[in-house]
Amino acid sequence: MTLETIDVTSVARRVVPEGCGATVTLDGYARRFTRVRETGEVRETEYLVYEAYEPMALKEMEKLIGRVKGEFEIANVGIVHRLGKLEIGETSVVI
């Protein structure tokens, strides 16, 4: 978890063991428009603010990593989630 801007390439490179030749990343970001499920209305987003109870969030991330590594043949998994105010287009999470 971080309050700083996330560098997607840097995060991916930190978790890749030397024996791996490729990475797969999910890059989540703050989007400009959101569709309301119940009404179908499209609303414009000005910015996002992420908050977390960090001890619990980190514990849940570790559980998620454990589940994924148990189900798939994956060498390593890393998750970085942004906290604080994000402007449109800024990265919110990298997995």
Residue ranges and their predicted role:
Residues 1-91:
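N-terminal, polar/charged subdomain of small-to-medium soluble alpha/beta proteins
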Residues 95:
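Phosphate/diphosphate ligand-binding glycine-rich loop within oxidoreductases
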